[in-house]
């Protein structure tokens, strides 16, 4: 039951991850054996639901990689369902201020600390009440990562960092660059300056900074600045680009694709 991902962040051990967008338990298991510290099952931009997340959690469970799940929104009902199927670490998107961060934390805690509904007899998380004292232990194993993706969220970062129960803050470079007027260009100097400043600020607060970036040089730079959970690729991108490159090498008509953010 111990959340080893949360423990690693608390100990200051950098965790390298991979984004999962294929919404497949089969590919999730394949990638769980690849050597990443964590795998992000994306419910915001990939066609996932509670059932597909459940199958991915089951597929990843035998491997050292730790699962992180991103719901589609900061919604306590959706969060409750994801926790009941076994999610312990959540990446909550588009958190704009401290109040929204508190709502995310409360959604992961049983009363009186929060508002998570008690349904452990039906929950994989408690192994259907086979885990002794699950209701008493669960709150401490929840890891809440909130995602800041706009100028407003950046402005409110000091207050977000003061919220008890927030374990880490993830910077969303794609949405942030769009909000700053540089859509599709997260490497713009102004965007990079904002990202670097935020990473340092988050780490100095005692929280864990995180980010997704497929550029290896930038990923290493963020780690040097103190980022603790860094996703360095996306499964859909890896598959698409590798397939195109293979087709091109054998003379097939590969589709010309403009390089994306990831």
Curated annotation (Swiss-Prot):
It holds the Pfam family HpcH_HpaI. It is an enzyme of class 4 (lyase). Homohexamer; trimer of dimers. GO terms for cellular component: cytoplasm. The keyword Zinc does not apply. Pathway: Aromatic compound metabolism; 4-hydroxyphenylacetate degradation; pyruvate and succinate semialdehyde from 4-hydroxyphenylacetate: step 7/7. Its EC number is 4.1.2.52. The keyword Lyase applies. A divalent metal cation binds at residues 149, 175. Belongs to the HpcH/HpaI aldolase family. Binds 1 divalent metal cation per subunit. Its cofactor is a divalent metal cation. Keywords: Aromatic hydrocarbons catabolism, Lyase, Metal-binding. This is 4-hydroxy-2-oxo-heptane-1,7-dioate aldolase. GO terms for molecular function: 4-hydroxy-2-ketopimelate aldolase activity; metal ion binding. It catalyses: 4-hydroxy-2-oxoheptanedioate = succinate semialdehyde + pyruvate. GO terms for biological process: 4-hydroxyphenylacetate catabolic process; phenylacetate catabolic process. NCBIfam families: HpaI (TIGR02311). The record marks 70 as: Transition state stabilizer. Gene3D superfamilies: Phosphoenolpyruvate-binding domains. The active site is at 45 (proton acceptor). Substrate binds at residues 147, 174-175. Catalyzes the reversible retro-aldol cleavage of 4-hydroxy-2-ketoheptane-1,7-dioate (HKHD) to pyruvate and succinic semialdehyde. It comes from Shigella boydii serotype 4 (strain Sb227).
């Amino acid at each position: 039951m111990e959340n080893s991902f949360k423990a690693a962040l608390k100990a200051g051990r950098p965790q390298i991850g991979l984004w999962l967008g294929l919404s497949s338990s089969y590919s999730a298991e394949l990638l769980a054996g690849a050597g990443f510290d964590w795998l992000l099952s994306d419910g915001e931009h990939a066609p996932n639901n509670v059932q597909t997340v459940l199958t991915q959690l089951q597929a990843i469970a035998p491997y050292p990689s730790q699962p992180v799940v991103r719901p589609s929104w900061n919604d306590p009902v959706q969060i409750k369902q994801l926790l009941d199927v076994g999610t312990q670490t959540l990446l909550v998107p588009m958190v704009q201020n401290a109040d929204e961060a508190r709502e995310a934390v409360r959604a992961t805690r049983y009363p009186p600390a929060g508002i998570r509904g008690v349904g452990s007899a039906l929950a994989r998380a408690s192994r259907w009440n086979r885990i002794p004292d699950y209701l008493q232990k669960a709150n401490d194993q929840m890891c809440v990562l909130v995602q800041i993706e706009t100028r407003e969220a950046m402005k409110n970062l000091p207050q977000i960092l003061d919220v008890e129960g927030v374990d880490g803050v993830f910077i969303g470079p794609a949405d942030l660059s769009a909000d700053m007027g540089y859509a599709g260009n997260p490497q713009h100097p102004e965007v990079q300056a904002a990202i670097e400043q935020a990473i340092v600020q988050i780490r100095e607060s005692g929280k864990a900074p995180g980010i997704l970036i497929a550029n290896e040089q930038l990923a290493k730079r963020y780690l040097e600045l103190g980022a603790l959970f860094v996703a360095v690729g996306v499964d859909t991108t890896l598959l698409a680009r590798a397939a195109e490159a293979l087709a091109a090498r054998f003379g097939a008509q590969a589709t010309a694709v403009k390089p994306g953010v990831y």
